[in-house]
UniProtKB/Swiss-Prot annotation:
Protein name stated in the entry: Uric acid transporter UacT
GO biological process: proton transmembrane transport; urate transport; xanthine transport
Residue stretches spanning the membrane: 30-50, 63-83, 93-113, 116-136, 143-163, 179-199, 205-225, 262-282, 338-358, 360-380, 393-413, 422-442
Effect seen on changing N319 to D/Q: Lack of activity
Key words of the record: Cell inner membrane, Cell membrane, Hydrogen ion transport, Ion transport, Membrane, Symport, Transmembrane, Transmembrane helix, Transport
Chain ranges on the Cytoplasmic side, renumbered to this chain: 1-29, 84-92, 137-142, 200-204, 283-337, 381-392, 443-482
Segments on the Periplasmic face: 51-62, 114-115, 164-178, 226-261, 359, 414-421
Phylogenetic classification of the source organism: Bacteria, Pseudomonadati, Pseudomonadota, Gammaproteobacteria, Enterobacterales
Effect listed in the UniProt record for changing R327G: Almost no change in activity
Keyword flag Repeat: no
Substitution effect: T259V: Almost no change in activity
């Protein structure tokens, strides 16, 4: 195997552009850039409580409480991930945390059980978050299984998976009876063109907020065309306190806990891919300790979610694309986003206003952002060796093919057991598992481990230094005729 296929991310303490990731911008820029991140993730963040509330037949007031709790928890967990707590948790990268779609189907199944209902979802969420927090070190130590070849496959599969979200947004959003309406497509295309023009001709900070300006432009255009629905804005309150266990004491059902834990382990693997993608974008090499700290926040954030009437949390892939587009790598921007999310959770009127942004407006921006994630994965794969190691072609081809299966054929796995559905319907998870297994099969695991030891050992460096000193001494003697 070539060297580039076997290099592993080194320790997080060296060779990292801390001036970019840790740089604190001016308050005005932090607010604007933070709001840009919030607008990108907002539709996905509120979709989960809306879906669960609708399927469980909850009242409008109960669903509104779920949304407020969800936004509040997204903000808290984002702050934990970006700021961190000592050496225990927090990857300290520009990450936005939000509820995961992977757990929606199991949560609905749990909630439909009349014996436990919504309280059973909260109980399973809290318990599964606690269990996976304990498992984070074990999962994080799988880093040797993710050389650049596998990392490239994972990031490419993330891009391929989420770009479908952008396409659905551009057409009006899934479930919209007017899906594909030419007006939606036209506005989405106009937003895309507007973002490209800002990116091409604007300079400095204006270029960095091209996505935000595009969303504002699309919102105004939609409003002038009577395509903005502001219903509920007048009735929404200005302030609401998010309290823990507002629906009652959680119910801890063993079967539900096991189901949710299995789903969260899958989410953890996807989170590793998100972290690796973000590390590649910001130019920061991640160690297994970085990954473990990030995964711990996933687990602790899930516990917080269950306690405060919300659901499992994970890093949001849409915002990874935004970091790539804006080239603003400061984690303090996402810290600003976390504060804004907390405020939105406590100010329902603002939350309703942001929720009124049509999905087709976000679609134009989504095509740019999600395509950038895909391009990052392709860039990593382009650096791998396919000339002397033909096995790498098989690994990439098969892994991406398997990963695209649930996206291209929704019914492909429909006849298989229901317990496997969360795994089989995650294209990212399928691509990741395929790439890891195939890479170990073709290229071996022990070979990677040996290279890791060499990369962190300075024994060879000392030997080479002594040899170089002896050579220089010999050359000087020859010059003086000694």
């Amino acid at each position: 195997m070539s060297a580039i296929d076997s290099q592993l991310p080194s320790s997080s303490g060296q060779d990292r552009p801390t001036d970019e990731v840790d740089r604190i911008l001016s308050p005005g820029k932090l607010i604007i850039l933070g709001l840009q991140h919030v607008l990108v993730m907002y539709a996905g963040a509120v979709a989960v409580p809306l879906m669960i509330g609708d399927r469980l037949g909850l009242s409008k007031e109960a669903i509104a409480m779920l949304i407020s709790s969800d936004l509040f928890c997204c903000g808290i967990v984002t702050l934990l991930q970006c700021i961190g707590i000592g050496r225990f948790m927090g990857i300290r990268l520009p990450v936005i945390m939000s509820v995961t779609f992977a757990a929606v189907t199991p949560m609905i199944a749990i909630g439909m059980n009349p014996d436990i209902g919504l309280l059973g979802i909260f109980g399973a969420t809290i318990a599964a978050g606690f269990i996976t927090t304990l498992l984070a070190p074990l999962i994080g130590r799988l880093m040797p299984l993710f050389p650049p070849l596998v990392t490239g496959v994972v990031i490419t599969s993330i891009g391929l998976s989420i770009i479908q979200v952008g396409i659905d947004w551009a057409a009006g959003g899934k479930g919209n009876p007017q899906y594909g309406n030419p007006v939606y497509l036209g506005i989405s295309f106009a937003v895309l063109i507007f973002i490209l023009l800002i990116t091409r001709y604007a300079k400095g900070f204006m270029s960095n907020v091209a996505v935000l300006l595009g969303i504002v432009f699309g919102f105004l255009l939609s409003w002038m065309m009577n395509e903005v629905n502001l219903s509920g804005l007048h009735d929404a309150s200005w302030f609401a306190i998010v309290t823990p266990m507002s629906f009652g004491m959680p119910i801890f059902d063993p079967v539900s806990i096991l189901t949710m834990t299995a789903v969260l382990i899958i989410v953890f693997i996807e989170s590793m891919g998100m972290f690796l993608a973000l590390g590649e974008i910001v130019g920061r090499k991640l160690s297994s300790h970085d990954i473990i700290r990030g995964l711990r926040v996933d687990g602790v954030g899930t516990m917080i979610g269950g306690t405060f009437n919300s659901f499992p949390h994970t890093s949001f892939s849409q915002n990874v694309g935004l970091v790539s587009v804006t080239r603003v790598h400061s984690r303090w921007v996402c810290i600003s986003s976390g504060i804004i999310l907390i405020l939105f959770g406590m100010v329902p009127k603002m939350a309703v206003l942001v929720a009124s942004i049509p999905q087709f407006v976000l679609g134009g921006a989504g095509l740019v952002m999600f395509g950038m994630v895909l391009a990052t994965g392709i860039r990593i794969l382009s650096r791998c060796n396919y000339t002397t190691n033909r096995y790498n072609l098989y690994i990439v081809a098969i892994s991406l093919g398997v990963g695209m299966t649930p996206t291209l054929s929704h019914d492909f796995f429909s006849k298989l057991p229901a317990v496997l559905q969360p795994l089989l319907h995650s294209g990212i998870m399928l691509a990741t598992l395929s790439a890891v297994v195939l890479n170990v099969f073709f290229n071996g695991y022990q070979h990677h481990a040996d290279l890791v030891k060499e990369s962190v050992s300075d024994k060879d460096l000392k030997v080479r230094t002594v040899r170089m000193w002896l050579l220089m001494r010999k050359l000087k003697k020859n010059e003086h005729g000694e």
